[in-house]
């Protein structure tokens, strides 16, 4: 079945003159828009908006929604994305009238409850990360990365250390790391991984110098491996005058067990939409708070939420601040959900999250290594990386395996990342999945590996049961069609 044949665009369903709404007669005089707006802003021809009945609109979008795939409908082992289940109590709390119906322009005195929640969330994140202060202002992970790097840049500039223009990043890092560093005005230097998949400390010593602003690390790293030499690496960077930046993408692997601040990190960003169950992957906005050690507090974006006696207030008196990085104070709704999750789980619950996430990943890794190559054969944390090189020799690529999983109602893992692993298959099961679900996925992966040996065509031509078959993904990325244009 071809989606283009069975489901036209809403514009293509349009019938001129068909009405899907009812408005009362206007009780005010008609006016000419040209009397109020410059002609440059007034359309010369009407907007080509779709004209449908309410029923047609309802059916169109309901049918579209039935083709969506999310964590509520199936297993979503997308490596490095922590696609865990989002508890619905989060949604209930976020819809409390005192949270849902307030406006950011209200006086502080009228939203003390909301400010108390944000302050308590900051305090919780300080404890979880081992930092000294947290701001909730950044909107998402990469935004948090950039904000943290801007703080580091401001710190060095305040100290007259303008020669520190380089940020060191491992060759296994998330792609956002070098991008954030570049946008923040830094040059990127790559440090190699060793044969165990960890940062090569000897190579780090070579690239660290007087021009080092920071080292950006994820721990555990993007291979799902814990950087056991982190304390030594922190000492190397600090002795050179640089700062240590923690990418919190993989906090789910160590939460409530160890703290980045205790490892020597100076700046941390978190992904509340991942680790702390805000909906993501198309389900809503993110939230990327950053935590800092004491000497970086003066540079935090303003305003800074503080508590004076029993009153919660925004403090703008930070003369060295990098300024605002987002209107108002972060994505409030996601912060409410994260706070609800933390309070629901408690310290012991957060420890169990980490333990189950690590257990699930190691269970799957050991079950799958018989059929797929395992580049780094050691205990992993919350995720692991396989290689499809064995299947590639049979004519089946990793992308084929990913497409074949769609036929079994599984979202594919992350593929071809990290870049240092050929035909990479990156799997993160999270803590919320049952053993039965894990076993079903394992059985499917083993079945696909067998198909690659005995009937490779069925894998090469997958998917077979989806509404859309193989798309030209390269063309879609390089020549996207972002708006509808009627054929004349």
Curated annotation (Swiss-Prot):
One of its GO terms (molecular function) is glycine binding. The lineage of its organism: Bacteria, Bacillati, Bacillota, Bacilli, Bacillales. The modification N6-(pyridoxal phosphate)lysine is found at residue 274. Its cofactor is pyridoxal 5'-phosphate. Pfam families: GcvP2_C (PF21478), GDC-P (PF02347). Its EC number is 1.4.4.2. It comes from Listeria monocytogenes serovar 1/2a (strain ATCC BAA-679 / EGD-e). The keyword Membrane does not apply. It is an enzyme of class 1 (oxidoreductase). It catalyses: N(6)-[(R)-lipoyl]-L-lysyl-[glycine-cleavage complex H protein] + glycine + H(+) = N(6)-[(R)-S(8)-aminomethyldihydrolipoyl]-L-lysyl-[glycine-cleavage complex H protein] + CO2. The glycine cleavage system catalyzes the degradation of glycine. The P protein binds the alpha-amino group of glycine through its pyridoxal phosphate cofactor; CO(2) is released and the remaining methylamine moiety is then transferred to the lipoamide cofactor of the H protein. Belongs to the GcvP family. C-terminal subunit subfamily. HAMAP family: GcvPB. One of its GO terms (cellular component) is glycine cleavage complex. The glycine cleavage system is composed of four proteins: P, T, L and H. In this organism, the P 'protein' is a heterodimer of two subunits. This is Probable glycine dehydrogenase (decarboxylating) subunit 2. GO terms for biological process: glycine decarboxylation via glycine cleavage system. Keywords: Oxidoreductase, Pyridoxal phosphate. It comes from the Bacteria.
